Amino acid sequence: MALKLVLMLMVALLAAVWSPPAVTASVTYDHKSVIINGQRRILISGSIHYPRSTPEMWPDLIQKAKDGGLDVIQTYVFWNGHEPSPGQYYFGGRYDLVRFLKLVKQAGLYAHLRIGPYVCAEWNFGGFPVWLKYVPGIHFRTDNGPFKAAMGKFTEKIVSMMKAEGLYETQGGPIILSQIENEYGPVEYYDGAAGKSYTNWAAKMAVGLNTGVPWVMCKQDDAPDPVINTCNGFYCDYFSPNKDNKPKMWTEAWTGWFTGFGGAVPQRPAEDMAFAVARFIQKGGSFINYYMYHGGTNFGRTAGGPFISTSYDYDAPIDEYGLLRQPKWGHLRDLHKAIKLCEPALVSGEPTITSLGQNQESYVYRSKSSCAAFLANFNSRYYATVTFNGMHYNLPPWSVSILPDCKTTVFNTARVGAQTTTMKMQYLGGFSWKAYTEDTDALNDNTFTKDGLVEQLSTTWDRSDYLWYTTYVDIAKNEEFLKTGKYPYLTVMSAGHAVHVFINGQLSGTAYGSLDNPKLTYSGSAKLWAGSNKISILSVSVGLPNVGNHFETWNTGVLGPVTLTGLNEGKRDLSLQKWTYQIGLHGETLSLHSLTGSSNVEWGEASQKQPLTWYKTFFNAPPGNEPLALDMNTMGKGQIWINGQSIGRYWPAYKASGSCGSCDYRGTYNEKKCLSNCGEASQRWYHVPRSWLIPTGNFLVVLEEWGGDPTGISMVKRSVASVCAEVEELQPTMDNWRTKAYGRPKVHLSCDPGQKMSKIKFASFGTPQGTCGSFSEGSCHAHKSYDAFEQEGLMQNCVGQEFCSVNVAPEVFGGDPCPGTMKKLAVEAICE
């Protein structure tokens, strides 16, 4: 018995020794920063929305974010993806939130979970499930019982799931922050006392879920304690939290802007993005999140707006396809390295601020063992030479220099050391098509007839983009237009977003709205004959609105009036007569986008310019690992499916309006400043995830609404075309600071894996002009500029290599071509 007791005691002691320690992690905050496990942190975050990429892409995206210097991955939670019908939840495929967060943890990063559950995000209906609109008595985002009950239930569902999976930092998981609501401040102002009451309820509800991590509210100046109010915008250096005990946080630093069908493509210069972030950190900010770090794709019908494009690239540091956008990714990576060198000083105390000139200033942070300085020139036109600590510093316009030891410049936001990459969409081949055209005279079994016009969303519940409105018009034989040939005019007024009008089975015309004005009026000649005439209006939605007040009041579809003018009687109002309605297209009912459903009809030879036509083909997966896309430039408007999965809507016929010109990083940025694609398709290429493909026999279906040319559709692959660098001979470098040594900066060039530099298109050490793709020699040029990259036997030879480095120094290029002049090296290499 004694022996047994001894053995039991030994087992107990061993268990105590070898049992894993209890989780003691904590996340709090003070006026300086978020505090993780007792340590103040400067946190760099980036938004990657899990449904906008495939699970197969997630590990690489997260790793590239980590390599870019990020500490945190931020994502919204998409209610309509997770609860498509009341009480029916889905967390699989692209909506596998738990898998995504575990990959974040596996990579050694934190997570910021923005539950919302309103997300905006240019996402269909702002993330709300459409069924929520039809809950009796509901009013969205206000002090309303039915809405609060549904919102609270979903929020608790997500929090409970996160707890069950051990995903909060206090459980050993990655989540260090959560968000409730989203940009509610402007709505609260509109809603008055009910809005204020709702804000307080939402905050109290969230905090009461006891996640163990702080909650934030963005664009919510009156966020109740202990919730932290945060900033969203292109710039947030001006922002201050509403209490002295809260840190200065930037939840959405917009890296670019979204693209709308019919709009140009916005781009934000890397220099300005870096300037905005450096200014925010300089002025006491401690958490910054790039919205977006990877934008991805609005697969299926998830794009909101309306009129938001299928691409959600956002000019993010990682592009829609998962490739690095250079120099933005590399320049921000270098910025993050510089900021991290300053972290001990930044979190220790308040800055000493000194004016260095009319538009120049210094912010100095000190700790017991460190000193960090930020020197800013916020003049948007002129360089400035400033004196700081007895030394002279040259500051380009609209820039910040970072000195992690208060002496040595390691980074300037306007001096880009990272390479610039130009991309190409390489043609891989076309397709052989079969076609099936919708019979506009045929109606499905799911039709109904009603006096007057119906609202589209309440009829379709967004199960389809399409709703047919069909009526009949009797024309007497004595109508004057039958003699003169001057046909009457049909006018259709719609709440949006597009209509295709068919008269007696023939397409008569099309009209559509825009991102800024989704409502539309169709007016066109109606070729009617004596007797009964069939008028069919196909109303098309292009994503549901994602921002605004009182979602429950929003309408789509043909609300009227619908009139005919030019008859003997003058005007005839058709709005109140009998209409027959059909939800969706016949091909949707038959599931023609699926391999099984496609066998339900007879397919014929493909023809061009045929409206409401389904096209199908089979193809083999292209070899290689490069991202793939479909070039849809010869088509009009419609949708695409591969192996039954929807790539999204396409609309290359909607050309981009706007003013596109040169882009200067200097000066305040907005979404209208740096535009491209004017006069061209807003979106030409549509991402085809490789993980959706099988080696052979992939099934591709295209639904064309207007009538395009399918013979012009092709598969392309996205890869690097050329790489460029432009580095000044005295450009600051991180390596020199670390080694406390003086050395020359280097140019680093790198093609994609599997590529090599085939030739040097341009090289000049001196005063070269232009930008990547259009460099030219300046008045000063070293005639041996090319030798450093091409001459055999040199250590830094680049031709034939995947990557290479070259010192930016006169001796490398045969001597100083212009003594006394500040020089730089510009180079462009072709990647094959």
Curated annotation (Swiss-Prot):
Active site at which residues? Answer: 183, 252
Stated family: Belongs to the glycosyl hydrolase 35 family.
Which terms does the record give in the GO molecular function aspect?
Answer: beta-galactosidase activity; carbohydrate binding
Which Pfam families does this UniProt record tie to the protein? BetaGal_gal-bd, GHD, Glyco_hydro_35, SUEL_Lectin
Q: Does this entry carry the keyword Signal? A: yes
Q: Which reaction does it catalyse?
A: Hydrolysis of terminal non-reducing beta-D-galactose residues in beta-D-galactosides
- Can you supply a Gene Ontology BP term from the record? carbohydrate metabolic process
Residues in domain SUEL-type lectin?
741-832
Instruction: Assign the protein's first listed, main location to one coarse class.
Output: secreted
Q: Could you say which EC number(s) this protein's record lists? A: 3.2.1.23
Cleaved signal peptide residues: 1-25
* Recorded GO CC terms: apoplast
- Its EC top class is hydrolase
What is the top-level taxon of the source organism?
A: Eukaryota
Q: What is this protein called?
A: Beta-galactosidase
The family database entries (InterPro entries) matched by this protein are listed as: BetaGal_gal-bd, Galactose-bd-like_sf, GHD, Gly_Hdrlase_35_cat, Glyco_hydro_35_CS, Glycoside_Hdrlase_35, Glycoside_hydrolase_SF, Lectin_gal-bd_dom
| Sorted UniProt keywords | Apoplast, Glycosidase, Hydrolase, Secreted, Signal
- Entry's localization field: Secreted, Extracellular space, Apoplast
